[in-house]
């Protein structure tokens, strides 16, 4: 009876140990409404290059149970809600100093020359050449909010293929930097993932050894009690006395 209770207790403890160690990284508690592609540990915060990448490409962030998820164009990055770099990034995004969702502040002044309407004799190549030397940052800033009276002039003077060229050039320049920062994120996350995967296995093995020792102790104690209650010499003497009594009764 005692052995059966001990076995049930062992099974319950093993189930509790497995349930407590099953959540690892993005799994367990972080699977649901806040999935994370990369999780940054509190012991190894991102370096300055990664922080610069996060400030530049941050689109939005979401407060989860015990961490914050930052949404980037390609992936999501999560960190503890009490970490310093997380608080800094949220404050930067809320104040409008970083991120795609906030308006950009352009330091260079806007110099725009009102060009006259082209005549039939003057070709439009001269006006097109003057627009080509404008910086791509100013062109991107002017496209969403054009100045009053200049919309018709831009549509006549700026070809569509030039705007596309500047946009694609900016994307090609930002792509190597994004790949390099993602590679650094993976390198920082590698040793941490190996350590976090080893700790649950060691704790589970320790629990199994402890429970096996408890079970062995209970079995040995039970056998000892049985030997004390029925010693071998006393049982043999009782058997001899019973045989003598039967022999005497048969003789009588």
From Swiss-Prot:
Single GO MF annotation: low-density lipoprotein particle receptor activity
Q: Which GO terms describe its cellular component?
A: extracellular space; membrane
What residue stretch is flagged as signal peptide? 1-25
What processes does the entry annotate via GO biological process terms? positive regulation of cell growth; positive regulation of cell migration; receptor-mediated endocytosis; response to tumor necrosis factor; response to type II interferon; T cell chemotaxis
Q: Which residues fall in a compositionally biased region of kind Basic and acidic residues?
A: 176-189
Annotated stretches, region: Disordered:
115-145, 163-195
Which Pfam family is one of this chain's hits? CXCL16
Membrane topology is: Single-pass type I membrane protein
Question: Which compartments is it annotated to reside in?
Answer: Membrane
Q: What UniProt keywords apply to this chain's record, in alphabetical order?
A: Chemotaxis, Cytokine, Disulfide bond, Glycoprotein, Membrane, Signal, Transmembrane, Transmembrane helix
Q: Where do the TM regions start and end?
A: 199-219
Recorded family membership: Belongs to the intercrine alpha (chemokine CxC) family.
Q: What is this protein called?
A: C-X-C motif chemokine 16
Native organism is Bos taurus (Bovine)
């Amino acid at each position: 009876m005692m052995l059966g209770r001990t076995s049930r207790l062992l099974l319950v403890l093993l189930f509790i140990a497995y349930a407590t160690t099953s959540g690892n990284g993005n799994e367990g508690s972080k699977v649901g409404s806040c999935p994370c592609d990369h999780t940054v540990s509190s012991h190894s915060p991102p370096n300055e290059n990664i922080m610069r990448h996060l400030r530049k490409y941050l689109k939005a962030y979401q407060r989860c149970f015990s961490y914050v998820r930052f949404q980037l164009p390609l992936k999501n990055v999560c960190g503890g809600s009490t970490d310093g770099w997380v608080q800094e990034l949220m404050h930067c995004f809320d104040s409008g100093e970083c991120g795609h969702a906030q308006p950009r502040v352009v330091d260079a002044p806007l110099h725009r020359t009102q060009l006259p309407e082209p005549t039939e004799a003057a070709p439009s190549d001269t006006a097109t050449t003057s627009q080509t030397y404008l910086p791509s940052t100013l062109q991107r800033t002017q496209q969403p909010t054009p100045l009053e009276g200049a919309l018709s002039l831009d549509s006549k003077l700026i070809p569509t293929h030039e705007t596309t060229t500047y946009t694609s050039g900016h994307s090609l320049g930002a792509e190597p930097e994004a790949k390099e920062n993602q590679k650094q994120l993976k390198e920082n996350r590698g040793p941490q993932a190996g350590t976090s995967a080893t700790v649950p296995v060691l704790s589970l093995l320790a629990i199994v050894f402890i429970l096996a020792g408890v079970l062995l102790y209970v079995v040995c104690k039970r056998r000892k009690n049985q030997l004390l209650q029925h010693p071998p010499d006393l049982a043999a003497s009782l058997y001899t006395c019973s045989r003598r009594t039967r022999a005497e009764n048969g003789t009588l």
